[in-house]
């Protein structure tokens, strides 16, 4: 009497089986209580024993026939034979012992019924060797329970014969007392047994015939094999033996165990705990033809370990240059040279058109960020372990790095201060974009250590990245190629003109290595601007398209005319140069990367002289003013492919009040150093195709602490080059408080070129 899952309980179908069980158990119990005691004394003690054994056998077979699986075939899935359900023929013929047997398609179970299988309309299942559905046992009679049903009929018939026979003996011996209770109950049991004896004996005889002939009730009723040969018969004895002694057929449908549903309820507003080591999430990205597999490990514990990291780690190890990859471009330089800081870092282009043509380059070490008021000392540079590196890749925009590229530098950044004005609000927006740009590079995270200047107050802003903090991956022009590291000697990140240089050593050199010039302790500064020679960014043109180079060539003539105008301006101002407004990030390190003769440094005056100086808001040199206007307008058209926090410094540079700055002096030891090798040029586009940007010879003054206001500063409007401020893009030297500069000034020409889509590039000559 197994019930298929999902069917409703129908109480009416249990009425026949409940009646049969009640009559069987009730009548037999009355017989054993009221009749068997006298039969035991008068006839034989074997009478109740015999009837008891037969009764137990009847109950056992009845239970097996009722609760046993008759051989139900499992239904096919909805989509398993969906096509066959519409196109399959209704019948198929198979050979059984050389006889064609027809199989019918079952539209309910979605398969062809095996031979002798039929679908039960009551149970709604296809049953193997289906005989019939018996309501007295409330179950189908099939291959697996037919044996117990047949034995139930035989034992029940024998039990009924015994009850009627021994009851008749008791009544005949108590004929004078028919009104007695024992005689009345015995006569009632005899009537019930005799009433059901006729159909039971008839049904038993019918199944005896079917068993001996090897047929089922369904085959007999439907007329199968009538007048023909039954392919399933085994002979009379063989059929009886097969029914009574054959092994039990396997069960095809196994009901799942009904276990109590354990549901763990958690109170609301509580987030589930994250695993400390979650499995990496593989993300397949498709953008601009580039597909990269990224492994992101998101876990709460990895973020917690970042804060728990000790702050006593040493500086990062020198880079390991991979030989054999673009050997013409990656020449292994000597340590300490300018090429050693540049050859191992390449930049991926920010324009989508260049993503398809990026070769893989080896990576270099990552140098920590410095913000205003914050500086990373050399020997105490802090790096995190690899276990925390890969766990910090919580990025809102996944990077598009190549799959074979190792972990890049994801730079630690601090949230900006609350905006106090419109300029601060604009700088905060730029800083948030810079966070996204810097977080696209997964890898080494560097902790920061704040540093305050000795004589200046802490600055109110924070910056995002330092000149040599971003990793480069190929040789195209992009946001990061303008941020290549400067001299191996290393410089302090200028948080403000008032912040001085603390003894920072480059991660590429040992703190005590040869060639590291001595650095005196910072002295008190005077409120003047120090020398700020400009240096071009070492960029590569290997991956530039022909369209960009054609645009470069088209603008060559116009830029040559502008250079002539700027040369006239240089003759007017002598040793003055064209610079941006003094900001914290316009003072960058790059002097060792330049080419050309040295020139004396410029000494800057106060902000009032800068504004009132020639070429800035005055009519002393209209030609220079026109060239500066056209230059700033072309620069300002650069798309914001990536943002930085330099606009915050521009806001501070425009604020009224005196500007503390580093002195315009050098130590005698630094003045006599030879010029290091120049920036390597691209083998593809070097020579006549390179053009120049304004950069005049700057006379270097002798060491002095006097404030000179002779030469005003030329100021260009704040603009962005390839998504960054020009001060950061040109990598000027980092200036600290009065004292020796980190690197001598060198003359270099830089060309600003507009590419496809308005992108502006700087090309060094």
Curated annotation (Swiss-Prot):
Q: Where are the transmembrane segments?
A: 14-34, 53-73, 149-169, 191-211
Task: Look up the domain of life of the source.
Answer: Eukaryota
Tissue localization of expression? Widely expressed.
Q: Which Pfam families match?
A: DHHC (PF01529)
Q: Name one GO biological process term.
A: regulation of postsynapse assembly
What are the alphabetically sorted keywords of the record?
Acyltransferase, Golgi apparatus, Host-virus interaction, Lipoprotein, Membrane, Methylation, Mitochondrion, Palmitate, Phosphoprotein, Transferase, Transmembrane, Transmembrane helix
GO molecular function list: palmitoyltransferase activity; protein-cysteine S-palmitoyltransferase activity
Q: Where is this region: Disordered?
A: 293-352, 509-540, 613-747
- Here the segments flagged for biased composition (Basic and acidic residues) are 301-311
Q: Which residues lie on this side of the membrane: Lumenal?
A: 35-52, 170-190
Report the membrane topology from the UniProt record.
Answer: Multi-pass membrane protein
Kindly list the positions at which Phosphoserine occurs in this protein: 337, 606, 627, 675, 682, 725, 743
* Location within or outside the cell: Golgi apparatus membrane; Mitochondrion membrane
Kindly list the positions at which Omega-N-methylarginine occurs in this protein.
Answer: 441
Q: Which reaction does it catalyse?
A: L-cysteinyl-[protein] + hexadecanoyl-CoA = S-hexadecanoyl-L-cysteinyl-[protein] + CoA
Enzyme Commission identifier(s): 2.3.1.225
Q: What class of enzyme is it?
A: transferase
Q: Where is the composition biased (Low complexity)?
A: 622-653
Give residue spans on the Cytoplasmic membrane side: 1-13, 74-148, 212-765
- Tell me the active site: 134 (s-palmitoyl cysteine intermediate)
**Mind telling me which InterPro entries this protein's record contains?**
Palmitoyltrfase_DHHC (IPR001594)
Q: Which family does it belong to?
A: Belongs to the DHHC palmitoyltransferase family. ERF2/ZDHHC9 subfamily.
Briefly state the protein's biological role: Palmitoyltransferase that catalyzes the addition of palmitate onto various protein substrates and therefore functions in several unrelated biological processes. Through the palmitoylation of ABCA1 regulates the localization of the transporter to the plasma membrane and thereby regulates its function in cholesterol and phospholipid efflux. Could also pamitoylate the D(2) dopamine receptor DRD2 and regulate its stability and localization to the plasma membrane. Could also play a role in glutamatergic transmission.
- Further facts: According to initial studies, defects in ZDHHC8 may contribute to susceptibility to schizophrenia. However, additional studies could not confirm this.
Domain comment, as recorded: The DHHC domain is required for palmitoyltransferase activity.
What name does UniProt use for this protein?
A: Palmitoyltransferase ZDHHC8
Query: Source species, please?
Result: Homo sapiens
Task: Identify the gene encoding this protein.
Answer: ZDHHC8
